[in-house]
Design a protein with these regions (language model features):
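Eukaryotic intrinsically disordered, low-complexity regulatory linkers and tails enriched in Ser/Thr/Pro
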Residues: 1-16, 20-99
């Protein structure tokens, strides 16, 4: 299965991008998770904004977790959506759901 069948959404679901379009993922000092897209004029999408979620920061390797999940799902059959969620008991997590 190719990465075009894997999609990544913002935490509020307002934007969804193809995982194959992502060329980089980062986390800044505020805990914002951003994805840099390979087309356009250096477009970025903020996937998680912990400031609006009462300042709960994601784990320091949260952006690496996304890369790992995309790699795993790229070999799976079917189409998937990955999105960050803030769980009160467990903090920030990546939720994966079939499409």
């Amino acid at each position: 299965m190719d990465a075009p069948y894997v999609w990544v959404a913002k935490d509020d679901g307002s934007d969804i991008v193809r995982a194959a379009a992502i060329i980089g993922v980062g986390i800044d000092y505020n805990g914002n998770i951003t994805a840099r897209l390979g087309h356009g004029e250096g477009a970025t999408v903020t996937l998680a904004n912990p400031g609006k979620e009462h300042g709960v920061h994601p784990p320091k390797d949260f952006h690496r977790q996304l890369i790992r999940i995309i790699a795993e799902l790229s070999d799976a059959s079917g189409a998937f959506l990955i999105r960050p969620v803030l769980d009160e008991a467990h903090g920030w997590q990546w939720l994966t759901e079939p499409l």
